[in-house]
Amino acid sequence: MRCQRCGNEDMNYFYQDEGVWYCRKCIGFGRIDVGKEPITRPCMRRRCKCHYTLSYPLTPKQQIAVASIMQYLKEGKDVLVYAACGAGKTELTMEAIQWYLCQGKKVGFAISRRQVVLEIQERMQQAFPMLQVIAVCEGFTDITDGDLIICTMHQLYRYHGWFDLLIMDEVDAFPYRDNALLEAIAM
């Protein structure tokens, strides 16, 4: 037996209810019966003629990093940006976000902490004023779709199969680090 949401195969986490088995490892994200795929809701997709603006220029090294990121993404490769806190990693993602949205693709930005979700949402809304930038975290779950979705790692369960580009920040921090359940939901 295998859960299609979290990948659990440990029988200790399965329970049978009226002849139907379901996974208890990820029950906090809603019940999913064995053999069923996570629910995929339709999402808004529109080709945006968006352009981001920053109130300051990127440094020459940041511009080189952006060019490398874009080269890898256009080749269909995953990218890891490893830099110190405050080095401008969020700004390095904006070119990629713009490129994907202009093609009508769906973009998500996941981060571990609620407060940072709200901060990133505000920064992205300033950089992309013509877009609907949505924050999805504790206390902000009424609207869950927009042009650009900024959410906590825990909220990724809502977006199974949605994102063409998923930017994950602070993957080395609690609660994502060493959490197999959140890793499975994100992938």
Residue map of PLM features:
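Inter-Walker segment of RecA-like/P-loop motor cores
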Residues: 123-160
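SF2 helicase catalytic motif II
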Residues: 158-187
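Interdomain "pre-motor" coupling segment immediately N-terminal to P-loop NTPase/helicase cores
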Residues: 1-45
